[in-house]
Structures are given as C-alpha cells and as structure tokens.
From Swiss-Prot:
Catalytic activity: GTP + H2O = GDP + phosphate + H(+)
Protein name: Tubulin alpha-3 chain
Gene3D superfamilies xrefs: Helix hairpin bin, Tubulin/FtsZ, C-terminal domain, Tubulin/FtsZ, GTPase domain
Any GO molecular function: structural constituent of cytoskeleton
Residues annotated to bind Mg(2+): 71
Organism encoding this protein: Caenorhabditis elegans
Length: 450
C-alpha cells in the first residue's frame, strides 16, 4: 500500500485536521469510534482508505496522523470531543506552554523539548506502513508553533526520511486581517527554513476563504469551523485520488512531477468549485464546463492574488463525482479558446486531469450543499509571487525599525537569521519573475502580442 502520514501542527493545523478527518470518516463510512459497519467491509473490496487509516485487530480504523501543539487547549478539545476514540492517545501530543506567536520559541526553546517525542510517534506510524509514500503537513505561517515547530520538524524529517515526499498545507497570513502582529516575521522565517525541505506547498489564506464563505454561502460572520470545513473539502479533493480508485489516479509524487517545474517554485494555488449553499444548489445544476470555468475566477481562489496578471506554468484539475473525460476535454478546450489564460511559453500544454468517481461528501448540517460533481484546481502560477511581495513588504516595514526583534533574539535566535531569510525570499520573488519572462529564443514573432 502507498500510505500517507498526516501531521497537524499548532492550532490551525489541528483544527484543519479535525475538519479533514471528520470528512474522511464520512467519505469512507467510518464511525467516530473507528468502526466501519460490516456491510461496507463485506460489500466493498475497496481498501484504498488504508492509505490514510490503519486497521487494528479489533476492526477499528485509526487515522495515520499525529497532532502536535505546544499548548494543550486545542488538542484537549479532541480528547473530549466526538472523535476522541478515533485517535490513539499517543497520536495527540501536547506541550505545557505555547510558542506565544514566536517562531524562535517554536523552533528553538519550546519546540526542542517536544521534537524527539514527536519524531518517535511518527516513527511508530511509519513502521506500521508497508510502503510509506510521504507526509502531509498542516500548519499556519503566522503562529509560533505553526511556523517554528513545523520548520524544525521538516528539517528532521528530511534527515530521517530523506526521499519521502513532504507536502504542506499552509495557512498564509491574510492581507487585511491579522491574528498576530509578528505574522510577517514568522512567515518569512518559516518559509526560508522549510523551502528546501518541502516538495510542494498548498497555500490557503483566511481572508480569501472568509470572502468565499460570505459571497457563496451567505454566511455573515464565518467562524473557523466554516473556514476549516471548506479547507477540508480542498484537502479531501487533493487526497481523494490516494483514498479511492479513480479513472485517472494521481499520487503524491505525481503532483510534484506535474506542478513543480523547479524545486523552489513549489507553491501551487488551490481553487475549489462549486462552493454553493444548499438553497442555491436546489435550483441549479452545475455542468462540468461551469464548474471548470468557476475555477478560473480569481474570487474562488484560496489565496488573494490575480492570475490574470501572471502566467500559468501548470494546471492540475481534480474532478470528483459524475464526470466523464469527454466533458472535461470539452471544458478545457473552451477555456483555452475564450479565456485570457496565459501560459509561460516554455510550457504549452499545461493541463493535467484526474477523475474520481466518488461524489463529493459534505458534513451533514454544514453550510455546503451536496453536489453531484466538484473540481479542485491546483495551478502553479507566477501570480502567487504577489502574495510573497505583500508579506515581504510588511516584513520590511517592521524590520527597518527592528520592532519586536528582541523577543526572537531572547529565545536564542540570531539577528542575522532575519536578514538571511529576507534575502532568500527576495530571491524567491526573483525566481518567480524570471520564470514568467519569455524565453530568449523568440525570433521577434511572438513579441507583437503585447
């Protein structure tokens, strides 16, 4: 089997973890106590779920996951919540004091105390796998644990499991709303440290998801639960190919092969459609062409940036439900003709398609409508550089005054790390810029389009 281990770090990672595992359980017919009612196990020969769940002797299904936080409150909610008997107590790891939004605490002082325990638990999960294909790491950029501890763990995973794929789902600080003043510092430090250890990083920004909840689901004041369930749908779409059999199956390494043209350019933009409330879905049936089209609308994206200003390097369309290749091909053809979608000139084709016949599942009583088909688009576009530029600018404003820096230095970090990280991100922006520039071999013919 090709197992995948999920690692959920810090408050954001753990709460997204809750949403994801809730959804996986519904999709696979696993009850909150880990039992799978017998009719399923008799009728379906489909055991693809074992990439994400391991089965115990007593017939319980345990997620291949670890949840880590440097303070206990968030994970305590799992220990007392609906899914308390789904996880093995050893999979829920908590420290005693939090990282206080400080990368240095998560990476050096507090994180150090818990890293070996965490790696030990991950090792146990890995030993339980027959053919581990890699790790999914969920965290935020802005928090202390999410930034500092994640980068520490990624470094150690690279040492212990060199060639295994590591994919991240990262919550990027929203442009307007902020949960911590020092988010730009944490984000840039963690990106710099993790850049060489991560194979592919799907970024999600809270503000973009707030807007989607407001606009598409008419939720006046979205809560984290609303946001996380939507993120859960995206994660589920991306991992569906690992958990179900489909016509065109995609595994972890296949994502990288198709989405990452250069090792550093590994931040695809995720878009999911249709995000639609039950009342609306009752009145409209969305075709493959329509949902595919919706993916190219900037307001359906999970990060605020405008692909119309950038160029696409690769696009991966993951369909689920009632979808046939003929419709997909037609939809893509239409988009290619009528859209102002620009591909970089060195990557002319650029569409990869995956189809899974398992229809999308929704949490009962949630905000999302049950739809017969959905699509998740992962696109590697140069426009995401806007997000880095935004963050770098905020970093510069604070760092010019050395604001808050003493908190980091006081936890054993050197000030040089700030400038080193900032230079690395400047280089990353430059990389994106260069990828988008047309190749030199234009003999003047293509130059007339602009």
């Amino acid at each position: 089997m090709r197992e995948v281990i999920s690692i959920h770090i810090g408050q954001a990672g753990v709460q997204i973890g809750n949403a994801c595992w809730e959804l996986y359980c519904l999709e696979h017919g696993i009850q909150p106590d880990g039992q799978m009612p017998s009719d399923k196990s008799l009728g379906g020969s489909d055991d693809s779920f074992s990439t994400f769940f391991s089965e115990t002797g007593s017939g319980r299904h345990v997620p291949r996951a670890v949840m880590v936080d440097l303070e206990p409150t968030v994970i305590d909610e799992i220990r007392t919540g609906t899914y308390r008997s789904l996880f093995h107590p050893e999979q829920l790891i908590t420290g005693k004091e939090d990282a206080a939004n400080n990368y240095a605490r998560g990476h050096y002082t507090i994180g150090k105390e818990i890293i070996d325990l965490t790696l030990d638990r991950i090792r146990r999960l890995a030993d339980n796998c027959t053919g581990l294909q890699g790790f999914l790491v969920f965290h935020s950029f802005g928090g202390g644990t999410g930034s500092g501890f994640t980068s520490l763990l990624m470094e150690r995973l690279s040492v212990d499991y060199g060639k295994k794929a590591k994919l991240e789902f990262s919550i990027y600080p929203a442009p307007q709303v902020s949960t911590a003043v020092v988010e730009p510092y944490n984000s840039i430090l963690t990106t710099h440290t993790t850049l060489e250890h991560s194979d592919c990083s799907f970024m999600v920004d809270n503000e973009a998801i707030y807007d989607i909840c407001r606009r598409n689901l008419d939720i006046e004041r979205p809560s984290y639960t609303n946001l996380n369930r939507l993120i859960g749908q995206i994660v589920s779409s991306i991992t569906a190919s690992l958990r179900f059999d489909g016509a065109l199956n995609v595994d972890l390494t296949e994502f990288q092969t198709n989405l990452v043209p250069y090792p550093r350019i590994h931040f695809p933009l995720a878009t999911f459609s249709p995000v639609i409330s039950a009342e609306k879905a009752y009145h409209e049936q969305l075709s493959v062409a329509e949902i595919t089209n919706m993916c190219f609308e900037p307001h359906n994206q999970m990060v605020k940036c405008d692909p119309r200003h950038g160029k696409y390097m690769a696009v991966c369309l993951l369909f689920r439900g009632d979808v046939v290749p003929k419709d997909v091909n037609a939809a893509i053809a239409t988009i290619k003709t009528k859209r102002s979608i620009q591909f970089v000139d060195w990557c002319p084709t650029g569409f990869k398609v995956g189809i899974n016949y398992q229809p999308p599942t929704v949490v009962p009583g949630g905000d999302l409508a049950k739809v017969p088909r959905a699509v998740c688009m992962l696109s590697n576009t140069t426009a995401i550089a806007e997000a880095w530029a935004r963050l770098d600018h905020k970093f510069d404003l604070m760092y010019a005054k050395r604001a808050f820096v003493h908190w980091y230095v006081g936890e054993g970090m050197e000030e040089g790390e700030f400038s080193e990280a900032r230079e690395d991100l400047a280089a990353l922006e430059k990389d994106y810029e260069e990828v988008g520039v047309d190749s030199m071999e234009d003999n003047g013919e293509e130059g007339d389009e602009y």
